């Protein structure tokens, strides 16, 4: 026979089958294909084809069960590969895997017999002796040497005993010679030829006709010439149907075969009971004789049997008559009596009895043959369809569930496979009889002997009998046994037929008893005996007062599913078998409503939010119930990741289930419904629409667009389409404005743009005109719909006011009510703006007016429900942001058309009146800001709670709310308020902030640009905040005057991955989860960041009511397309708009700028707006974190327009975030990631990293901005510090205008920065900065919030709070006074001057490219690190120094060098996307994260940690400015060999630092130190070029040291003392650890680490608690934001912070010494360390010090202060801690001279796995830098985002790993 399949492939397939079975899995086609392709490299398509051919060949057996096809090895069909059919070595079944192939054909029975007989032991032989004997046989060496021999031998012996071949007495085995009663009769006559009695035909068998034999074996399809083993073998043919089979396939032994040939043999389908001779009756209870293969009903046996006998069974015909019949009769009578009475008898016996007798009810007959093991025991699955049973009236055809297909009567037979079942299979195992009552599903085991061949055929078609058949008809229903092998078919026969057996044996009395028992059993389960087999299990349920027919089967446990009726408790949904059980349960069940919180109640309807993780059983039961009415539902048991919103109708009895929908807690695609179901009795009453509406309400409250999980079922599609149509028509009916955008609709309705676009297409309301998409209003359609609605109002309408619900921890989605309100207003404004062209025009004419009008619009557009719209806002923002050029259509392909046209419209309107949109937004923001501020705080807190530190935030919700959720927003609110200066600006600028926020969503690019121009500080802050502020910022913005900020937050960066686990991990960092790097851009539901961005953008647009509206409509479509372009445009555009020296450009101008470039102007306008906002309010500083998103663009602006810096930075921060996110989504994954990382998003590793990188970039970009962003973070720690920092920089920015820039950076530096920035980084900055700001904002904000929370908690709730805040304030005041103004001014000036690149301002060394600025390692010294803008890419940084400069630099591309290593190590994100813009973004991340990891550590730190105020502000102003300078020359800070002159640094202030690139390092120290004490000294001209970058980072850490006071608030968790201890230890170790000399080596690290430790550590260690150690306080508070940025670039920034902490902990001189040891630069740091009493106090706290040495190597920014990393761990704030851990590891690594531990980096990322991976890159690079390219396996620290773990990051090198474990520093810190 020619084989169709390639024999080699067939062999591979069989191997795969064995392999899969060995893994205890079903050999499905998919698994087989996978296994073969994996092991042999064959492509799956070929495998699939070969598998089919092999099945056709017969070399592979295909078995269908429950509709699923499985494949078996015909030679080894059993569970274990069994022996070839011919041999009986059934025992071989157990053989596993390929090695079994050798043992496959071994006949274990023969071997055992040979051994036992050979040993000739009288009492039998032990298995050990048998094994020894067999091993001694030379001819068996091949078998005995097999590794599985012993196991297989034992298995063979066991099976032989079970089959009766061997007898086992104790441990001895002996051959069974057969027992008197036949039970022991040998199974294989061959073994005991005399055992089987001779057979003879019975009288009724003679002269019967015989059917023509079919010459093909029904099992192997072979012929008599070729059986399965390709050997000739005679066929046995059925006398009735002619079906044939090989004895080997039937598993007949030779003796049985000989006997059967002499008799009239019947196959299993035709088998007739030889006693009652009724064919087909009760076939399930038929036994097959192992001697003649005749069939007997158990009740027909003599004596009748109640259960299947075990082992061999010989019928009464063959059984020798022994001791007369009397004995048998007596025994039979006993058995009869014992089992006749149903009452006391065991259940299964009764069942069996019932089965055998009950014909009406339908007895269960097991097809599994009862025969000898050798016989085909395969269970026959009866394939008769339920209807078939009834249909076939003939008893003969229906007698067996499985009828021979060949017979005409066998309608029941579904599969032909039944034909192939051997006769033995037919034999029913009497044991299988089960109760028909269905109470339990019985698995009928076939006799052991016959089990081997369990081939189940087509189980899928057999279900438990449900059909009621007329009594006369014997219908067999099929019950699938739990065991796949056995199918039980229930034979329904009339009761009278059931007893056709040996009548003399079954008396009438017995029959009556049986029938009575049967009836009782049926009553108990309350179902008629003949239940129809409807194919649904269960077919009916009793639920409450309803009896409901099910629609589909549900996977209830078999014993329940097989019941005709299931009883469910309507409250707890528990399922029960009978009414009695239900009644008993209902008395005990104390549930009257779902086990969850009621989040909605109106009239008699309630909705409960059930957490699948909390109420697992309830949710599983709910899913099982839902499956009864849903066709395509696959999830029943894995309910933990879901929330179930259960709708109930309430009365006095309880809350009765109406329906529910489930929702994934963290869904990347932002699906708001996974499964939705309404109970049948409540359908057609509007509840489905109610739940759909409710799901969208939740999405709106979360501030993001939602969409049901795709694909939708048919019913779901209908329901949703109807809902979408009605919602859109009603929206259009309410909004008659000329410009309507998909974005606006999305924001108002919560629908995702794709669904809106689809629906508009269905409504034929979208068209393409002039190459643009436009929405066509079909008034008739709209009015017709409204008429229908009026005529028949909806019965169950949702009332949003009745919802009492706070969004989950989802950082981006979480929006507090206040935030929602703020968002609502903003959205309303937006709506108005988009709705009312007139207003837009007015706004265009008068921007101020437009602002006012936008405010008006807000109130007018209440319908929009900004909170509700918020979800969509992000997406809309996307659309708006998208410009035609951007072709963001790709991102949302489905939305593409609609969005495009809408966007185009929006764009047109925007172009037409660009200023309007921007201006109204700003105006509305300003207006709203005051009232929204509080709201924002609340929102922020919520966000914080969910994303960063839920507990901490909750406790200090009020205080932490703003800072945590939106670092930027929060910072202005709390910090601004506390800081006198800030509050003043706050009042003026808050509106701007809001405006910026809205802008962000609407004009991400603008925001970026503005941020880049205005908000160098903010950029840093924004980056930090962006993560934290993504939420906080959005919240803030929303609260301030636009919900958009919230939306922005909620929206994930497009590329960012949103993971619940991650979110959960950093619940507190929830806000920071903006880095949805993994979400594909085209996902309609963009990452929350993206949505947030879009929403913010739109909100900002909305804020400008006229313009907002116009923008909405036109921009929505345009934005979608141009989003990328916009962002890029922003990058480019900022230069012109931001260039204006009057950075403060009129709001109108700013607005105009925005409006001018919805695509390009949008960027500018937003920047301007942001600048304005910054001017208007220090709050903008809070936004600054966001602005970090566009820090680079802002930097450009700032450089050019120092005045704009203050306002703009904040504004930009806000706006940038959305833009950034969006861009980040599409183009700048890095940006988003950096933002997220800055935000302290451990949960979104990638995004976090990106965010962090971006944040750092932003920090780098904006030296001043970092100051702002840090203040934002600091806000948590101490608002005062942040405020002072923010306000001072702003004031300076505003007052000084360009002065700050020059201050921040010497003209040369500025020029360098500018040149670099302009050349490389302007665009990149804008692009990169924006995204970084956005994402970092959330994370940073969260981190800050966690710290702030703790600080606030300390202030509000905890005793530490006052301390921390005091420390913070002292630091803030100190820093503020000394550095803040100076730095702010300088920074601003520098930044603006270096308009090109924030980094540029800090860029002290021309060698460092602008990219460096963006690169994470350059955060503080942005310009030093050539800013790594998306354009430039971090790798571009030409000088090693640049790379080094930014330890946080996420420049995987830099992996080749220590510098590059540093860069990539900077952020996980960066690592991941090291070569591309990501690195640039990481640079932003860097600054945000590490507060400029390399040089910008302090600035970044300040941004990150509000607590860093003093030192941080010193850092911030000085450091921020310095950061700018340092960032510009990131190496500068690191390089500051003259770290020993920290005071100089302070004195130096940003300007000095900036001017003196090399000294910049010392400056950074000063910054870090918080006090001006060390500002000037920090400048180390000596370490100019090479060290500059590295020092920037490390110096910053050193500065942190100097600002030891910052550490005071290690977050409530850490005590100052502990921090100090850690710091001291760390510092001590740190110094030795980092060798200043090696850029690649640790020498440089030391120097770098010193500055870093000053800068970064301060931030990290700065805790709001420590007033005396203001820097410490700052550090603690700062850490969260910093941490946030560090998450990606965390190692450097964190290291910086840690170092700072370390330095702080150690005396400044000490630090200096350490650093000096590392490098000359470091020495200055030590001085700085002695910065302030606080510093001294917190020296130990600031363990970051040790890290100071970490990155000293100028070229080795990479050295990220490893020691510092440890110090960070001290931070109590969870997010903060995580970051600190990262920093610690980095610092430690640097210090140790080992590689930076990935954990440091990772922990910074909130255990973001993705970022952790990235971290490894960076740490590796860093390590290389520190250790001379000694890569260390980065062990991801994966500490929970909020875990306050010193050692969260395990270093590769002991102490490094522990974060400080090996270093003494580590040890002391560990005890934190």
UniProtKB/Swiss-Prot annotation:
Zn finger spans (PHD-type): 214-273, 270-321
SMART domains: H15 (SM00526), PHD (SM00249)
Chain intervals for the UniProt region annotation (Catalytic): 536-826
Chain residues that bind acetyl-CoA: 674-678, 683-689, 713
Catalysed reactions listed for this entry: L-lysyl-[protein] + acetyl-CoA = N(6)-acetyl-L-lysyl-[protein] + CoA + H(+)
Keyword Zinc included in the entry's annotation: yes
Biased composition (Acidic residues): 887-909, 1155-1176, 1208-1217
Location of the active site: 709
One GO MF term attached to the UniProt entry: zinc ion binding
Sequence segments annotated as region (Interaction with BRPF1): 570-826
Domain MYST-type HAT: 533-807
Zinc fingers (C2HC MYST-type), renumbered ranges: 566-591
Gene Ontology process terms (BP): cellular response to leukemia inhibitory factor; negative regulation of DNA-templated transcription; nucleosome assembly; positive regulation of DNA-templated transcription; regulation of developmental process; regulation of DNA-templated transcription; regulation of hemopoiesis
Keyword Cell membrane: no
Domain H15 residue range list: 104-177
Cellular component GO terms held in the UniProt record: MOZ/MORF histone acetyltransferase complex; nucleosome; nucleus
Subunit relationships: Component of the MOZ/MORF complex composed at least of ING5, KAT6A, KAT6B, MEAF6 and one of BRPF1, BRD1/BRPF2 and BRPF3. Interacts with RUNX1 and RUNX2.
Alphabetized PANTHER family for the sequence: HISTONE ACETYLTRANSFERASE, HISTONE ACETYLTRANSFERASE KAT6B
Family: Belongs to the MYST (SAS/MOZ) family.
Name this polypeptide is given: Histone acetyltransferase KAT6B
Originating species: Mus musculus (Mouse)
Taxonomic classification: Eukaryota, Metazoa, Chordata, Craniata, Vertebrata
Gene that this polypeptide is encoded by: Kat6b
């Amino acid at each position: 026979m020619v084989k169709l399949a390639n024999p080699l492939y067939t062999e591979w397939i069989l191997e795969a089958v064995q392999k899969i079975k060995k893994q205890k899995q079903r050999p499905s086609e998919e698994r087989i294909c996978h296994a073969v392709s994996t092991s042999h490299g064959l492509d799956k398509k070929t495998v699939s084809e070969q598998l089919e051919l092999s099945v056709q060949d017969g070399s592979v057996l295909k078995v269908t069960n429950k509709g699923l096809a499985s494949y078996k090895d015909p030679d080894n069909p059993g569970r274990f590969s069994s022996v070839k059919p011919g041999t009986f070595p059934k025992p071989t079944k157990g053989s596993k895997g390929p090695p079994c192939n050798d043992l496959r054909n071994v006949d274990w029975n023969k071997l055992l017999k040979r051994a036992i007989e050979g040993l000739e032991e009288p009492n039998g032989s032990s298995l050990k002796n048998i094994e020894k004997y067999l091993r001694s046989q030379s001819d068996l060496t091949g078998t005995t040497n097999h590794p599985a021999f012993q196991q297989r031998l034992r298995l063979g012996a066991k099976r032989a005993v079970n089959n009766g071949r061997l007898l086992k007495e104790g441990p001895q085995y002996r051959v069974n010679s057969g027992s008197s009663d036949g039970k022991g009769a040998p199974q294989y006559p061959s073994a005991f030829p005399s055992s089987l009695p001779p057979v003879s035909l019975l009288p009724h068998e003679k002269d019967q006709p015989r059917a023509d034999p079919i010459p093909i074996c029904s099992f192997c399809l072979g012929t008599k010439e070729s059986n399965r083993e390709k050997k000739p073998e005679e066929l046995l043919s059925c006398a009735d149907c002619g079906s044939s089979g090989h004895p080997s396939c039937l598993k007949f032994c030779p003796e049985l075969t000989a006997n059967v040939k002499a008799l009239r043999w019947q196959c299993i389908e035709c088998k007739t009971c030889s006693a009652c001779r009724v064919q087909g009756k009760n076939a399930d209870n038929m036994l097959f004789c192992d001697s003649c293969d005749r069939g007997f009903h158990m009740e027909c046996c003599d004596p009748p049997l109640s259960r299947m006998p075990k082992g061999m069974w010989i019928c009464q015909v063959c059984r020798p008559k022994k001791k007369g019949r009397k004995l048998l009769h007596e025994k039979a009578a006993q058995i009869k009596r014992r089992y006749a009475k149903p009452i006391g008898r065991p259940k299964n016996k009764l069942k069996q009895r019932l089965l055998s007798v009950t014909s009406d009810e339908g007895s269960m007959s097991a097809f599994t043959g009862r025969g000898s093991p050798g016989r085909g025991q395969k269970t026959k699955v009866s394939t008769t369809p339920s209807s078939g049973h009834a249909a076939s009236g003939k008893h003969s055809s229906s007698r067996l569930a499985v009828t021979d297909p060949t017979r005409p009567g066998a309608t029941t037979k579904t599969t032909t496979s039944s034909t192939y079942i051997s006769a033995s299979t037919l034999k029913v195992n009497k044991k299988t009889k089960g109760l028909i009552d269905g109470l339990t599903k019985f698995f009928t085991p076939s006799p052991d002997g016959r089990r081997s061949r369990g081939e189940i055929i087509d189980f899928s078609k057999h279900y438990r009998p449900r059909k009621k058949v007329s009594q006369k008809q014997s219908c067999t229903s099929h019950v699938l046994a739990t065991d796949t092998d056995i199918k039980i078919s229930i034979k329904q026969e009339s009761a009278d037929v059931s007893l056709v057996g040996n009548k003399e044996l079954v008396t009438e009395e017995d029959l009556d008893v049986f029938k009575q028992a049967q009836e009782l059993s049926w009553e108990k389960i309350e179902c008629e005996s003949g239940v129809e087999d409807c194919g649904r299990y269960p077919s009916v349920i009793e639920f409450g007062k309803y009896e409901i027919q099910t629609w589909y089967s549900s996977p209830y446990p078999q014993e329940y599913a097989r019941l005709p009726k299931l009883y469910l408790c309507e409250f707890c949904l528990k399922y029960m078998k009978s009414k009695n059980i239900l009644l008993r349960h209902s008395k005990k069940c104390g549930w009257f409503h779902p086990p969850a919180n009621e989040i909605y109640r109106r009239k008699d309807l309630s909705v409960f939010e059930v957490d699948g993780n909390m109420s697992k059983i309830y949710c599983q039961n709910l899913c099982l119930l839902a499956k009864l009415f849903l066709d395509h539902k696959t999830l029943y048991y894995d309910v933990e990741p879901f929330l179930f919103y259960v709708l109930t109708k309430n009365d006095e009895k309880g809350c009765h289930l109406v329906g529910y929908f489930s929702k994934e807690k963290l869904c990347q695609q932002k699906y708001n419904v996974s499964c939705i179901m309404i109970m049948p009795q409540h359908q057609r009453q509007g509840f489905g629409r109610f739940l759909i509406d409710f799901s969208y309400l939740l999405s709106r409250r979360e501030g993001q667009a939602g969409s049901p999980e795709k694909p939708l079922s048919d019913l779901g599609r209908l329901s949703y389409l109807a809902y979408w149509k009605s919602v859109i028509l009603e929206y259009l009916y309410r909004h008659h404005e000329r410009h309507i955008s998909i974005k606006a609709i999305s924001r108002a309705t919560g629908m995702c743009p794709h669904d809106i676009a689809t629906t508009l297409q269905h409504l034929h309301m979208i068209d393409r005109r002039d190459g643009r998409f436009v929405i066509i209003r079909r008034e008739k359609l709209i009015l017709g719909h409204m008429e229908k609605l009026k005529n028949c109002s909806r019965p169950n309408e949702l009332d949003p006011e009745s919802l009492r619900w706070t969004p989950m921890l989802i950082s981006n989605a979480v929006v507090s009510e206040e935030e929602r309100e703020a968002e609502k207003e903003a959205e309303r404004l937006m709506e108005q703006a988009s709705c009312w062209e007139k207003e837009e025009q007015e706004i265009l004419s008068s921007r101020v007016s437009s602002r006012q009008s936008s405010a008006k619009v807000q109130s007018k557009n209440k319908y929009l429900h900004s909170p509700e719209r918020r979800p969509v806002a992000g997406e809309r923002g996307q659309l708006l942001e998208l410009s035609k050029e951007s072709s963001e259509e790709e991102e949302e392909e489905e939305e593409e058309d609609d969005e495009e046209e809408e966007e185009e419209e929006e764009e047109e309107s925007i172009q037409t009146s660009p200023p309007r949109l921007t201006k109204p937004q700003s105006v509305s923001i300003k207006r709203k800001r005051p009232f929204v501020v509080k709201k924002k705080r609340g929102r922020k807190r919520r966000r914080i709670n969910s994303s960063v530190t839920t507990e901490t935030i909750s406790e200090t919700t009020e205080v932490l709310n703003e800072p945590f959720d939106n670092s930027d927003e929060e910072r202005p609110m709390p910090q601004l308020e506390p800081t006198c200066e800030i509050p003043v600006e706050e009042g003026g600028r808050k509106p701007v902030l809001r405006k910026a926020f809205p802008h962000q969503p609407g004009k991400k690019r603008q925001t970026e640009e503005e941020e880049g121009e205005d908000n160098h500080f903010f950029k840093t802050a924004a980056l930090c905040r962006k993560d934290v502020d993504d939420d906080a910022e959005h919240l803030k913005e929303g609260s301030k005057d636009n919900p958009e900020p919230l939306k922005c937050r909620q929206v994930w960066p497009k590329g960012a991955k949103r993971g619940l686990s991650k979110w959960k991990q950093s619940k507190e960092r929830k806000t920071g989860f903006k880095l949805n790097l993994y979400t594909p851009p085209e996902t309609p539901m963009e990452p929350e960041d993206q949505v947030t961005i879009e929403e913010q953008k739109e909100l900002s647009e909305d804020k400008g009511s006229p313009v907002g509206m116009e923008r909405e409509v036109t921009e929505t479509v345009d934005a979608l397309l141009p989003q990328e372009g916009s962002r890029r445009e922003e990058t480019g555009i900022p230069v012109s708009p931001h260039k204006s020296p009057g950075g403060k450009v009129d709001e109108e101008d700013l607005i105009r700028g925005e409006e001018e470039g919805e695509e390009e102007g949008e960027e500018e306008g937003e920047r301007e707006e942001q600048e304005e906002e910054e001017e208007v309010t220090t709050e903008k500083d809070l936004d600054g974190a966001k602005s970090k998103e566009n820090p680079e663009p802002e930097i450009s602006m700032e450089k050019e327009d120092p005045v704009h810096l203050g306002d703009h930075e904040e504004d930009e921060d806000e706006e940038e975030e959305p833009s950034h996110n969006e861009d980040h989504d599409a183009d700048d994954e890095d940006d988003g990631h950096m933002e997220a990382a800055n935000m302290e998003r451990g949960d979104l590793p990638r995004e976090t990293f990106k965010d962090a990188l971006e944040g750092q970039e932003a920090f780098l970009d904006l030296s001043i901005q970092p100051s702002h962003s840090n203040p934002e973070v600091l806000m948590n720690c101490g608002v005062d510090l942040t405020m002072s920092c923010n306000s001072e920089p702003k004031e300076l920015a505003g007052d000084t205008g360009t002065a700050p820039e020059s201050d921040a950076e010497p003209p040369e530096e500025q020029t360098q920065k500018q040149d670099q920035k302009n050349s490389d980084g302007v665009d990149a900055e804008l692009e990169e900065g924006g995204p970084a700001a956005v994402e970092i904002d959330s994370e940073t904000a969260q981190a800050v919030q966690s710290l702030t929370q703790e600080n606030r908690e300390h202030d509000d709730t905890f005793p530490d709070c006052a301390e921390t805040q005091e420390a913070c304030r002292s630091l803030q005041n100190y820093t503020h006074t000394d550095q803040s103004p100076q730095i702010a001014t300088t920074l601003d000036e520098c930044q603006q001057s270096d308009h090109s690149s924030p980094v540029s301002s800090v860029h002290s060394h021309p060698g460092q490219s602008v990219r460096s600025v963006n690169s994470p390692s350059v955060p503080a010294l942005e310009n030093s690190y050539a800013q790594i803008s998306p354009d430039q890419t971090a790798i571009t940084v030409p000088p090693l120094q640049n790379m080094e400069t930014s330890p946080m630099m996420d420049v995987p591309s830099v992996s080749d060098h220590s510098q590059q290593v540093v860069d990539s190590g900077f952020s996980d994100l960066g690592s991941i996307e090291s070569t591309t813009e990501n690195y640039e973004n990481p640079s932003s991340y860097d600054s945000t994260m590490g507060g400029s990891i390399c040089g910008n550590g302090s600035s970044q730190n300040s941004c990150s940690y509000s607590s860093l105020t003093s030192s941080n502000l010193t850092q911030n102003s000085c450091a921020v400015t310095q950061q700018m300078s340092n960032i510009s020359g990131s190496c500068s800070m690191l390089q500051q060999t003259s770290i020993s002159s920290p005071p100089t640094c302070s004195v130096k202030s940003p300007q000095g630092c900036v001017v003196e690139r090399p000294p910049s390092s010392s400056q950074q120290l000063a910054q870090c130190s918080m006090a001006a004490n060390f500002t000037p000294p920090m400048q180390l001209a000596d370490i100019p070029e090479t060290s500059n970058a590295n020092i920037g980072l490390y110096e910053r850490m050193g500065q942190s040291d100097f600002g030891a006071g910052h550490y005071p608030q290690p977050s409530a968790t850490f005590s100052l003392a502990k921090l100090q201890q850690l710091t001291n230890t760390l510092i001590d170790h740190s110094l030795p650890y980092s060798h200043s000399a090696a850029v690649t080596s640790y020498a440089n690290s030391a120097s770098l680490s010193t500055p870093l430790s000053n800068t970064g550590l301060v931030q990290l260690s700065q805790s709001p608690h420590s007033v005396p150690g203001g820097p410490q306080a700052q550090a603690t508070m700062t850490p969260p934001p910093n941490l946030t940025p560090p998450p990606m670039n965390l190692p450097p920034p964190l290291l910086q912070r840690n170092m700072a902490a370390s330095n702080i902990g150690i005396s400044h001189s000490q630090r200096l010494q350490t650093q000096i040891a590392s490098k000359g630069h470091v020495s200055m740091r030590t001085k700085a360390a002695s910065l302030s009493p606080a510093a001294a106090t917190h020296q130990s706290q600031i363990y970051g010090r040790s890290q100071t040495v970490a990155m000293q190597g100028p070229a080795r920014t990479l050295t990220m202060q490893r020691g510092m990393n440890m110090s960070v761990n001290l931070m109590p704030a969870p997010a903060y801690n995580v970051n600190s851990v990262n920093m610690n590891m980095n610092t430690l690594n640097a210090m140790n001279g080992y590689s930076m531990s990935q954990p440091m980096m990772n922990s910074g990322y909130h255990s973001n796995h993705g970022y952790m991976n990235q971290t490894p890159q960076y740490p590796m690079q860093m390590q290389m830098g520190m250790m001379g390219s000694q890569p260390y396996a980065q062990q991801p620290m994966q500490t929970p985002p909020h875990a306050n773990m010193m050692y969260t990051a395990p270093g590769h090198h002991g102490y490094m790993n522990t974060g400080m474990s090996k270093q003494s520093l580590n040890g002391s810190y560990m005890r934190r």
